Amino acid sequence: MTEWETATPAVAETPDIKLFGKWSTDDVQINDISLQDYIAVKEKYAKYLPHSAGRYAANGFRKAQCPIVERLTNSMMMHGRNNGKKLMTVRIVKHAFEIIHLLTGENPLQVLVNAIINSGPREDSTRIGRAGTVRRQAVDVSPLRRVNQAIWLLCTGAREAAFRNIKTIAECLADELINARKGSSNSYAIKKKDELERVAKSNR
């Protein structure tokens, strides 16, 4: 037998994909069992950059498979003047994650996941009625909408905090995520969530 036949095949190891080359997804825990299918953060969804150019709006529920950091990045591209500037928002998120790591010493992905879990309202009120009589009725919120609303509230809070402020939007996003992770009332998202749940409770 020649040495070619006896040689053991080299096993190509898959490289460990880290977000921005720094943050690993392996140790990220999703403590809320109802949101585990809707927060895409596991190895399967790992990306070097939060930009996959996927067609997530093609089907309902497809966006649940969009990596959660990419959903945050896309949500930061709001208000006309920032529409389509994804490179700018990727840079903002990267900077915010570095600030979070400096302030907390934790994996920023874990901080983001915890902030989303804490910021999603569990109960909301909807309008029910016909022929002129409208009343509000408390309803449970689906897991996907909880994630959608949490991301929207976190981004809105960061955007409003940075407006006419000396702090950069990356610093405001980092503060918002850290406060939401703690459940602090300094967070815009937590305040809004509590308000929505309070209104829903009064409409039960």
UniProtKB/Swiss-Prot annotation:
Modified residues (Phosphothreonine): 14
InterPro entries: Ribosomal_uS7, Ribosomal_uS7_CS, Ribosomal_uS7_dom, Ribosomal_uS7_dom_sf, Ribosomal_uS7_euk/arc
Sites of N6-acetyllysine modification: 47
Any one Gene Ontology BP term: ribosomal small subunit biogenesis
Modified sites of kind N-acetylmethionine: 1
Cross-link (Glycyl lysine isopeptide (Lys-Gly) (interchain with G-Cter in SUMO2)): 47
Cell compartment(s), UniProt: Cytoplasm; Nucleus, Nucleolus
Modified residues (Phosphoserine): 142
Domain of life: Eukaryota
Gene Ontology molecular function, alphabetical: mRNA binding; rRNA binding; structural constituent of ribosome
Entry's Gene Ontology cellular component terms: cytosolic ribosome; cytosolic small ribosomal subunit; nucleolus; ribonucleoprotein complex; ribosome; small-subunit processome; synapse
Entry keywords, A to Z: Acetylation, Cytoplasm, Isopeptide bond, Nucleus, Phosphoprotein, Ribonucleoprotein, Ribosomal protein, Ubl conjugation
One of the Pfam families matching this protein, by short name: Ribosomal_S7
Positions where N-acetylthreonine occurs in the chain: 2
Subunit (UniProt): Component of the small ribosomal subunit. Part of the small subunit (SSU) processome, composed of more than 70 proteins and the RNA chaperone small nucleolar RNA (snoRNA) U3.
NCBIfam families listed in its UniProt record: PRK04027.1, uS7_euk_arch
Family to which this protein belongs: Belongs to the universal ribosomal protein uS7 family.
Function statement: Component of the small ribosomal subunit. The ribosome is a large ribonucleoprotein complex responsible for the synthesis of proteins in the cell. Part of the small subunit (SSU) processome, first precursor of the small eukaryotic ribosomal subunit. During the assembly of the SSU processome in the nucleolus, many ribosome biogenesis factors, an RNA chaperone and ribosomal proteins associate with the nascent pre-rRNA and work in concert to generate RNA folding, modifications, rearrangements and cleavage as well as targeted degradation of pre-ribosomal RNA by the RNA exosome.
PANTHER family the UniProt entry points to: RIBOSOMAL PROTEIN S7 (PTHR11205)
Protein's recorded name: Small ribosomal subunit protein uS7
Protein encoded by which gene: Rps5
